[in-house]
Amino acid sequence: MVNSTILVTVVLVLALRALQWCSGYQHKFIDMIWCKPVALKLQGLIKKRRELHLAQQSTSAQDEYAKWTKLNRQIAQLDTQVKQTQEQLVENRKVGEKNLGKLRLVFFTAPLLVLRFWKGKLPVYALPSGMFPRVVESVLSQGWAAAALAPVRFVWASGTVKPMQVETPVCLAIWLWALSRVLDTSEFVVRSLCM
């Protein structure tokens, strides 16, 4: 059970990181899924406008005024259509970004949050006791709530001695936090070195 929980956690964290790394390509992904018909229509309109513009450039305004004016009107109409299609594409992108955000929440963020609360105190591995101060050991074994409750525990149990433990378990929530920090730091180092 512990191994499968750890495996699911690692897969979710890595998938979420991969999704964040690919966020630079988010507009292409959204265009491919939600905006393809509008993007194709816009591409066709721009191509047609370019052809008409080239035809207008090759036509002499003084010699063939009627043809040049007709092309000019067609270009003006295409400009308004291009502008409307671009506005429609922006609206579709906003809808796509909202939907992608919902998918990210449902498939990655929510399961990680559930794992943190439901299986947060599940021991992942153990460290030798006495390796860290008692406060740090309690955070490692019980999560971040132990750090917040440390003053209360100190006041309530001021005279009692904690029984000696051979090992200090590291809970899933702390392990997940440490994994996220390691990935964040590695990503920062790679981006810093590449720039």
UniProtKB/Swiss-Prot annotation:
Quaternary structure, from the entry: Component of the Golgi to ER traffic (GET) complex, which is composed of GET1, GET2 and GET3. Within the complex, GET1 and GET2 form a heterotetramer which is stabilized by phosphatidylinositol binding and which binds to the GET3 homodimer.
Subcellular location per the Swiss-Prot or TrEMBL entry: Endoplasmic reticulum membrane; Golgi apparatus membrane
InterPro entries: Get1 (IPR028945), Get1_fungi (IPR027538), Helix_hairpin_bin_sf (IPR029012)
Protein name: Golgi to ER traffic protein 1
Coiled-coil regions listed in the entry: 67-94
GO MF term (any one): protein-membrane adaptor activity
Alphabetically ordered keywords of this record: Coiled coil, Endoplasmic reticulum, ER-Golgi transport, Golgi apparatus, Membrane, Transmembrane, Transmembrane helix, Transport
Functional summary from the UniProt entry: Required for the post-translational delivery of tail-anchored (TA) proteins to the endoplasmic reticulum. Together with GET2, acts as a membrane receptor for soluble GET3, which recognizes and selectively binds the transmembrane domain of TA proteins in the cytosol. The GET complex cooperates with the HDEL receptor ERD2 to mediate the ATP-dependent retrieval of resident ER proteins that contain a C-terminal H-D-E-L retention signal from the Golgi to the ER.
GO cellular component terms given for this protein: endoplasmic reticulum membrane; GET complex; Golgi membrane
Keyword Coiled coil in record: yes
Primary location recorded for the protein, binned into one broad class: endoplasmic reticulum
UniProt family annotation: Belongs to the WRB/GET1 family.
Cytoplasmic compartment spans: 24-104, 187-195
HAMAP family: Get1
Keyword Lipoprotein recorded: no
Pfam families named among the record's database cross-references: CHD5
Lumenal compartment residues: 1-6, 126-169
Membrane spanning stretches: 7-23, 105-125, 170-186
Origin superkingdom: Eukaryota
